[in-house]
Amino acid sequence: MSYYIRQSVLTIIWLIVALLLVMSLISYSANDPSWSHINSAVNEVSNLAGTGGAWLADILYAFLGAASWWLIVIACYEAWNVWRHDVEPNGLLRFLGYIFLIIATAGLTGVLSFGWLAQGMIGQIVGNGLSSLLTYWGTLLFLLVFIAITVTFTFDLHWHEILSGQAIRSRLQAEAADDDEANTKLKA
C-alpha cells in the first residue's frame, strides 16, 4: 500500500472515531439502556450513535466524566499527526501523555465538584485523594499546572511561539518545507 493511501486511510479512521465520540457524548441520555442502567421501557434509543453509542457514552461519563471530551481532541490531533513529517516516533510517550491528561482533567473536575456527570469515578478518586494531601487550593494549582505541562509535551506546543504569534507561521513554513522535500523525493 502506498504511503499516501495509508495516510488517507488512517486520517479517515481517526476522523470517524472523533465523529462517533462526538455523536455519542453529545446525545447522551440517562434514559437510554446502557452499562450503568437498564431501561426496558424505552423502545427507541435517543443516542445519535445508537445503542453502542449509548453504552460508550455511559461508560466514558461514568469513569472519566467531562474529561471524555479529550478523546475527541486526541482523535483529531492524531488525524492531523498522520500528515506531519516532523513527528518523532514517540507514540508510547504521547499515549502516556494522553492518559495523564485525561486523568488530571477528570481530577480537576472532581475537585471543582461540577457534579457526577462531569467528574466521573476517576475524577472523584483523584480529586478527593489529592485534596486530602494538598488541600483544595493546592490540588487545584497542582492539577492546573500538571495539565498545562502535559498539554505542552503531549501536543508538542511551544509557548514562546504561541505567545509571540509565531506558532502558525512557523508551522506553515515547516509544513511547506516538508512538502517540498517530499515532492523532490517523489520526482527523483
Per-segment meaning from a language model:
Residues 1-188:
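Alpha-helical transmembrane segments used as membrane anchors
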